[in-house]
Amino acid sequence: MSGALETTEEFGNRFVAAIDSAGLAILVSVGHQTGLLDTMAGLPPATSMEIAEAAGLEERYVREWLGGMTTGQIVEYDAGSSTYSLPAHRAGMLTRAAGPDNLAVIAQFVSLLGEVEQKVIRCFREGGGVPYSEYPRFHKLMAEMSGMVFDAALIDVVLPLVDGLPDRLRSGADVADFGCGSGRAVKLMAQAFGASRFTGIDFSDEAVAAGTEEAARLGLANATFERHDLAELDKVGAYDVITVFDAIHDQAQPARVLQNIYRALRPGGVLLMVDIKASSQLEDNVGVPLSTYLYTTSLMHCMTVSLALDGAGLGTVWGRQLATSMLADAGFTDVTVAEIESDVLNNYYIARK
């Protein structure tokens, strides 16, 4: 709707709906974390007590949650029998069984970002940023969200976007995942391609330790993990393939990191960079689903953690145009951009050296 055509009353109604939706997102987050959504998906119409008992939760809290989920038109309520149900077509978008279609995972970020609201407001007045240490849950949630996509699509959909890559990995290649987190992608690739060698690189000691422990538990001799600051990484011609999953826009020095990636690749090597699907031009993002959410995530996390390190503050919505330009500046001359159906949030950049 154009602002010139919208009345004050229409705007008021639209904003009231936005507030209502924010409340609903929190309820969905609670339903995901408590297992209520998964529990209800497996139940016939049931009372609040029956649902609480099935989920192992306190009935009074469950009943209040059901009230909001009913008025939010996610849960159906039968007043005659005092029973609640979660229709299958909604469960198919809100439960763990939905895999990468599970929108309840994204809903968790609404309350998480609210936890740092006052700290971000202080930065509006004083400058600087909010450091990673203030987000103890963020990386766990990111791992959960990206893990859904990885499990469903990494081996069979994402890697084949790079022409010839699966065959190259089956033959044996040196691969690094920059900003690997706890190593979900490294684990999946190492399991699928035993002839290749995979190195996960991350700034976090905790992430590197978790990845190392998981690789040992699974007996993955072809997966190792190293702690490095990507902006200071000094590897030359070390890898045939480098992957980066939603990590560049958070970097304090993203241009330097891309240059280091280019240097670390061997001639003929390839970078598979996954990052947020958006335009670098604000006007192109107006009316695009989840754009407001992405700008909010940038303000409340991605931009500010970079600024906390005296970084560039690139932000979540740096966009396709800037991304391809920065890849070119780093030395990549052959860059293509792909999309996959199971991931509505990201572009897949394929850059060859």
Swiss-Prot record:
The keyword Iron does not apply. It comes from the Bacteria. Keywords: Methyltransferase, S-adenosyl-L-methionine, Transferase. GO terms for biological process: cellular response to hypoxia; methylation. GO terms for molecular function: methyltransferase activity. It holds the Pfam family HTH_65. S-adenosyl-L-methionine binds at residues 146, 179, 202-203, 229-230, 251. Coiled coil: none annotated. InterPro entries: Methyltranfer_dom (IPR025714), Rv2258c-like_HTH (IPR048711), SAM-binding_MTase (IPR053173), SAM-dependent_MTases_sf (IPR029063). One of its GO terms (cellular component) is plasma membrane. Its EC number is 2.1.1.-. Homodimer. Co-immunoprecipitates with DarG in the presence and absence of darT. Probable methyltransferase that may target bulky nonpolar molecules with aromatic rings. Consists of two domains which are linked by a long alpha-helix. The N-terminal domain is essential for dimerization and the C-terminal domain has the class I MTase fold. Belongs to the class I-like SAM-binding methyltransferase superfamily. This is S-adenosylmethionine-dependent methyltransferase Rv2258c. It comes from Mycobacterium tuberculosis (strain ATCC 25618 / H37Rv).
